[in-house]
Amino acid sequence: MQEKAKQYEYLIFDADHTVIDFDADERRAFRAAFAAAGMDASADMVEACWAFSAQNWAQLGLNDVHLPELRARYHELYHTHVREIIHYMDTMYALGTRKGAAEAAFSDTLAMAAHPVAGAAETLTALAQKYRLCIATNGLAAMQAGRLSELAHLFSHVFVSETMGVIKPDAAFFERMLEALDTSSDRCLMIGDSLSSDI
C-alpha cells in the first residue's frame, strides 16, 4: 500500500540565494558606494570588491554557523564585515573623505528591495494559493525587511535572526518560530540552499 504523502501547512523559505539574489544585490551596493565616493566603478572594481567580501565573510567565520562562539557574535561580526569591506575599498581605491558616504550608500543600497532569484516571484505566488509561506533568515532585521519588501505580501511571517535573538540552525530558532506559528514541525517544510545553515 502506497504511503500517503505528507500534507504541509507551512513552507518556510530561507531568503538569500533561495528567494532573493544576494550576489546581485551586493554588486549593486558596491556600485552605489563607489558612486557616493564620486567614482565611476568599472566591472573589475566591483568584482574585486565582491571577491574580497566573500573571502572576508569566510575569514570572519560567518559560514561556521554551527560554532557556539559564532552564533553568539554573528550580528556583531556582520557589522565588522561591512566595515572591513569599506576599509578594503578605501585601501584599494582611495575613498578619502568620502569613505563615510560610501559606507552609508553601501548599507542603504543593500537594504533596498532585492533582486528576486529567477522564477521566485512566480513560484511563490503559485505556492501561496495552497500553503502559508514564511521566511526564516539570518541577518539584520531592518536590512532584511527592506530586501524582502517587494515579496513581503506573499509571506504570513518573516523570521529574522536578529529579532529572534538566535541564528539558524540553532534549534531555539525553529522552536521560537513554531511557537509563533502555533504549529508543529511535521506541518512545516524548510526550503533553503544550504543543508548546513538552513536546517
List each model region and its residues.
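Receiver (REC) domain switch/active-site residues of two-component response regulators
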Residues: D16, S156-H157
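Short hydrophobic segments within beta-strands
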Residues: D14-A15, A136, I191
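N-terminal helical cap/lid subdomain that shapes the substrate entry/recognition surface
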Residues: A5-A118
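Core-facing hydrophobic residues within beta-strands of well-ordered domains
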Residues: Y8, L154-F155, S185
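Conserved Lys-Pro-Asp/Glu-containing loop-to-beta segment of HAD-superfamily phosphomonoesterases
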Residues: I167-I199
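Catalytic P-loop NTPase motifs of RecA-like helicase/translocase cores
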Residues: V19-D21, M143, S197-D198
